[in-house]
Swiss-Prot record:
It comes from the Bacteria. It holds the Pfam family OSCP. The keyword tRNA processing does not apply. It is found in: Cell membrane. This is ATP synthase subunit delta. Keywords: ATP synthesis, Cell membrane, CF(1), Hydrogen ion transport, Ion transport, Membrane, Transport. The keyword Transport applies. One of its GO terms (molecular function) is proton-transporting ATP synthase activity, rotational mechanism. It is a peripheral membrane protein. The gene is atpH. Its main location: membrane. F(1)F(0) ATP synthase produces ATP from ADP in the presence of a proton or sodium gradient. F-type ATPases consist of two structural domains, F(1) containing the extramembraneous catalytic core and F(0) containing the membrane proton channel, linked together by a central stalk and a peripheral stalk. During catalysis, ATP synthesis in the catalytic domain of F(1) is coupled via a rotary mechanism of the central stalk subunits to proton translocation. This protein is part of the stalk that links CF(0) to CF(1). It either transmits conformational changes from CF(0) to CF(1) or is implicated in proton conduction.
């Protein structure tokens, strides 16, 4: 992706977040964007919208189906992107919107990797640890299971990592023995 395309994506995303922040509709925007991104993940919509083999009329129809019950500002963005023939960038714009929302609200997705699935109590404790140690609000809690950790967990938030896994401790111990 070129710098010009990245700047374009960033401009669309920042503009939408700014308007929604002024109108106090950030939570509704986040819910709508997450719902649309789920559609992208469940289907091959990103490839379809960027494919020149798919007729423009079909791409217009697909994006208009996404409009539905979204907040008006998101629907306006979708319409502007269609008018400017930039539907191929929609997926990247929506991802960037989530990133902008996180930075504006200081609320980030938390990825927890553990050897076994976490209980609800453990998930709540993770949220507490993140808010206290990293000084951020927790958005969605994304849970991953990796048996190679042996025990403990890894928390990743906004490019910050807390790693208390047994695997890391064993690696550190091994390095100390050298």
């Amino acid at each position: 992706m070129t710098k010009k395309e990245q700047a374009l994506i960033e401009q669309y995303a920042k503009s939408l977040v700014q308007v929604c922040q002024e109108r106090d509709t950030l939570e509704a925007l986040q819910a709508d964007v997450l719902a649309i991104l789920e559609v992208f993940k469940a289907t091959n919509l990103a490839k379809t919208l960027s494919s020149l083999a798919v007729p423009r009329a079909k791409r217009l129809e697909l994006v208009r189906q996404l409009q539905g019950d979204n907040i008006v500002y998101l629907n306006n963005l979708l319409e502007v992107m269609l008018q400017n023939e930039r539907e191929a960038y929609l997926y990247q714009v929506l991802l960037r919107v989530l990133s902008e929302l996180a930075s504006v609200s200081n609320q980030y997705d938390v990825t927890v990797t553990s050897a076994v699935p976490l209980s609800e109590e453990q998930k709540q404790r993770v949220r507490t640890v993140v808010s206290k140690r990293l000084a951020v609000k927790t958005g969605r809690l994304i849970e991953k299971v990796d048996p190679s950790l042996i025990g403990g967990f890894m928390i990743s938030v906004n490019n910050k990592v807390i790693d208390t896994s047994i695997r890391r401790q064993l690696q550190a111990f091994k390095m100390n023995l050298k």
